[in-house]
Amino acid sequence: MLHAFAGGTDGANPNGGLVLNSNGTLFGTTYTGGNQSCQYFQDEIGCGTAFELRRPTKKGGAWAERQLHVFTDGSDGATPNGGLIRDANGALYGTGQGGANRGQGIVFRLEGKSGGRWEDITIYDFPSNDLNGSSPLAGLILDAKGNLWGTASSGGTDGGGTIFRLRPAGKSWSFTVLHDFTGAPDGSRPSASLIFDAAGNLYGTTQYSGSGQACGNYGCGTVFEVWP
């Protein structure tokens, strides 16, 4: 065991995966914990954290955990459910399911600064009308051009969630909805990360809907392909 989360200010419930840098440092998120004054949960269990685990310098030594950011349910969002990804410059990207200025979730960037400090930047705040999607549960993927691709588990024109792309445009980002899930038969509630093939096509899953009736009105879920 490398680290046991203690809840409270340490963080709790790491639901997403990890990413590793060239030095062997691990980066990840916790869904809760951190700031105990967070208002996203009524029982004040915290809005989540982004953390690193540094490899010990000596064999058999302890890994050192450090929080990079504590989510506050302010403009920085809340409850990062997916893991982080890392670009060629070492910046980290992820999603927060809730919070932010409109309460519908965010896409964020963590950028390392001098002195070991990390700066949290919200690069997209999902709108309150839900048309671009809301509540992103999954992490992101990154292509060679620096575009980010992801899913929102709900919202969109039919309420079943969306697939989206964020393209860097100078110091800002351009957001595009690639697909709106409609429920039956194409699925709803995409909750896991996407993958690419060599041609740039996207593949993923939805938790609900599809043509199968064995799971009742919600459906049993789907596997999908999208051609960007």
Placement of each model-derived feature along the sequence:
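Extracellular beta-propeller repeat domains
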Residues: 1-228
